[in-house]
Amino acid sequence: SSSAASDVYKRQEATTEAAVDRFHSLAGELRDTEAALSHTSQLMGAVVKYAKTRPVFDGYKAARYSKKYLAQHEAELSDYRAAKAAMSELLDGAKLPKMDALKKRRRELSEKKKALYAEYRKAQADMREAVAVKGNIDFLRGYPDGREDKAQER
């Protein structure tokens, strides 16, 4: 009977480990998806700001970089430079995708995040349950931290 109990315990240990691994794996995937979503949204924001301020910059160029024009449009030109720098940093040498492609990517990432989050919550509940069950078994078996060889380790 002790061997049957030992098998049950080993199965519970494996179940717990798998539940913990799944939770951590989903947490990582969720983090990566959120980072990609944030990156895409930032890039879209920079593209919009760039498009809005580009005509002002073109006007500045056409005015041969006149101090008077600069003084009249300082805020827009500053926004233009900031948007251009943000795009350059976010793209990191890559080609700028079309706005439609960015919108599609943001939509897909948003849906993926939603689905992942639901899986993540379930995995979290499964993990908590498995850890609690294992903890109860450990307690009943008299292993405060789930280790039989604790005394030998010291």
PLM feature spans:
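Conserved phosphate/pyrophosphate-binding and hydrolysis machinery centered on Walker-type P-loop NTPases
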Residues: 16
